Regions:
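Amphipathic alpha-helical packing segments from all-alpha helical-bundle domains
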Residues: 71, 115-143, 147-151, 177
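Short, basic, alpha-helical segments at the C-terminal edge of helix-turn-helix-like DNA-binding modules
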Residues: 64-70
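Hydrophobic alpha-helical connector segments
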Residues: 61, 74-99, 146, 150-153, ...
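Amphipathic alpha-helical segments used for helix-helix packing
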Residues: 97-118
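Short alpha-helical scaffolding segments that buttress acidic/His motifs in well-ordered protein cores
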Residues: 92-93, 107-111, 153-160
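N-terminal intrinsically disordered/low-complexity leader segments
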Residues: 1-11, 194-203
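Helix-turn-helix
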Residues: 15, 19, 23-57, 61
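Hydrophobic alpha-helical segments that form the core
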Residues: 144-166, 174-185
Length: 203
């Protein structure tokens, strides 16, 4: 296949994955068949089988691609300045719910299904790697080891996802308050340690 043909094939495949995922997100995994997917894409069922082996392949690839895009959207909003951190923590759950609530509900339908759970494990292995790298980038700015930052990021992500799916304000506020307290304690602790005379001597 020529490069231009490959690019066009991939462009069309991405469009199909996005439209199919949106269709599932609006209607639920169990309520949508190949015919309804084709209608949402403006094509015939046969066209979908050019790009995907079967319905399972379409579901797996569409979920992985679209949720990676959601993750990219989240990371694009993530602060690099520590001064923006608390504001970000307060705002990001509501943004996540508005922008991606339906997509997260569908993701959990897919990745908790016995047929697809192994793909969910693979997806979240990638998530773990990417957020660990983000934590490493924050380490010199916050003065907190990335091994401490990483679990705090995971708590924030889980809190955002839970709120996006269920809009549970009580759970959200309790988690955010605990998270912000933990961050403040960590920042105080590591600043205190850095200020110790023996710490300066070691450095």
């Amino acid at each position: 296949m020529r490069t231009r043909d490959q690019e066009e094939f991939q462009r069309k495949k991405i469009m199909l994955m996005e439209k199919c995922y949106d269709c599932y997100a609006e209607n639920g995994l169990a309520s949508v068949g190949i015919r309804k997917l084709a209608e949402s894409c403006g094509c015939s069922s046969a066209v979908l089988y050019i790009y995907f082996r079967d319905l399972d392949d379409l579901i797996v690839q569409s979920t992985a691609y679209c949720m990676k895009k959601v993750e990219d959207d989240f990371m694009a909003k993530a602060p690099t300045d520590p001064q923006d951190l608390m504001r970000f923590i307060d705002e990001i759950p509501y943004w996540t719910a508005r922008q991606h609530g339906k997509k997260y509900r569908l993701m959990y339908q897919v990745y908790t299904h016995p047929k697809y759970i192994r793909y969910g494990k693979q997806f979240f292995e990638g998530v773990n790697r990417r957020y660990t790298e983000y934590a490493k980038s924050l380490e010199p700015k916050l003065g907190i080891p990335y091994t401490t930052i990483t679990p705090l990021i995971f708590i924030l992500i889980q809190t955002c996802v839970h709120y996006a799916m269920f809009e549970d304000e009580c759970y959200l506020q309790s988690q955010l308050e605990a998270l912000k307290q933990a961050i403040r304690l960590c920042m105080t602790q590591y600043r205190t340690e850095d200020a110790r005379p023996d710490a300066k001597a070691e450095s």
